[in-house]
Amino acid sequence: MASGVRQELAQLMNSSGSHKDLAGKYRQILEKALQFTDAEQLEALKAFVEAMVNENVSLVISRQLLTDFCAHLPNLPDDIAKVVCHFTLEKIQPRVISFEEQVASIRQHLATIYEKQEDWRNAAQVLVGIPLETGQKQYNVDYKLDTYLKIARLYLEDDDPVQAEAYINRASLLQNESTNEQLQIHYKVCYARVLDYRRKFIEAAQRYNELSYKSIVHETERLEALKHALHCTILASAGQQRSRMLATLFKDERCQQLAAYGILEKMYLDRIIRGNQLQEFAAMLMPHQKATTADGSSILDRAVIEHNLLSASKLYNNITFEELGALLEIPPAKAEKIASQMITEGRMNGFIDQIDGIVHFETREPLPTWDKQIQSLCFQVNNLLEKISQTAPEWTAQAIEAQMSQ
């Protein structure tokens, strides 16, 4: 019974003997407490914890036995382990400096329980309580990096990218010191996700694209990273950085396997995209990517409007706001506002004549335009040749040989 355990502990605390003998006797009591079930087990373990944090018990024995106690936590039912962990943390608090290592183990296990229950915020907050930088114990770099990444990931699951960013920034200070390649990958994935959640889409796309080339990452996960890179690029604000990223992805043959390749192709080739062409792509987006902007439009709508405006600037020398609004499928006033913002931010070349209600686009140089069109044509021809060679390899070989012999 639990009361018997409590009595044995009281007697042992008042007895004398060597540390080794006393530790052995306390360990026997712990084993006995673990044999109980349900409420009896809970009460017996609480009694054991109270004895271990009592100042009458040698600190050497307390630390040793609490370490053993922590090792048994994963074997307990989650509901009992959860109560025991909270009880232990509360009782240890006045002497927390003496038991930093044991507290860290308890918090790690408690966070695992909360994570199983999908209580992301409590799991994160439990880990935050580990004094990684301020405690007396010196934690190794990998342990600190792993813990910060866990906290950031848990806050992301709880839809709190602000807190996640705070902890990924702490991880950033450590990641160069770690030689653990797996942790480095976890850091890159987590950092890309934070940028994605924070709507820093072009930076997120660059990180995801980098991950898609890492040989240590499984092939299916590399393709998943590439998909996220493509989605983030499409959602990014129009401009030179996005254009470069579109070019990188368009030239990556793996993108042809992705469902959003059609949108990528239209964007890279500066084609106008209509609203009805976006429904399938919109369904692929994650919840945070479907959020609305300050003017009430979705992130995707805003990105496509900016893309279409940039495409229009390459088709027209100038256009009235009425015509521009009709082309972009938005009110003229909104078209003017977006055009003005893009010109001001240097993402589009041109100027606005508000008296006549016209936006003038900077004259395009014909040579770069021709170069891009020729490049696009060559790319399409190359794709056709590859498909022909896959379907009829013998005919292709004969045709190439005949061409070479001329």
UniProtKB/Swiss-Prot annotation:
Gene3D superfamilies in the cross-refs: Tetratricopeptide repeat domain, Winged helix-like DNA-binding domain superfamily/Winged helix DNA-binding domain
Q: Does the keyword Ribosomal protein apply?
A: no
Report the function annotation for this chain. Answer: Component of the COP9 signalosome complex (CSN), a complex involved in various cellular and developmental processes. The CSN complex is an essential regulator of the ubiquitin (Ubl) conjugation pathway by mediating the deneddylation of the cullin subunits of E3 ligase complexes, leading to modify the Ubl ligase activity.
Q: Which InterPro entries match?
A: CSN4_HTH, PCI_dom, PSMD12-CSN4-like_N, PSMD12/CSN4, TPR-like_helical_dom_sf, WH-like_DNA-bd_sf, WH_DNA-bd_sf
**UniProt-recorded name of the protein:** COP9 signalosome complex subunit 4
Q: Please, which domain of life does this record's source organism belong to?
A: Eukaryota
* SMART domains noted in UniProt: PINT (SM00088)
| Assembly description | Component of the CSN complex, probably composed of cops1, cops2, cops3, cops4, cops5, cops6, cops7, cops8 and cops9.
- Domain PCI: residue ranges: 197-366
UniProt keyword Nucleus present: yes
The entry assigns this protein to a family as follows: Belongs to the CSN4 family.
- Key words of the record: Cytoplasm, Cytoplasmic vesicle, Nucleus, Signalosome, Synapse
Q: What main location does UniProt list?
A: cytoplasm
Q: Where in the cell is it found?
A: Cytoplasm; Nucleus; Cytoplasmic vesicle, Secretory vesicle, Synaptic vesicle
Encoding gene (name): cops4
A Gene Ontology term for the protein's cellular component: synaptic vesicle
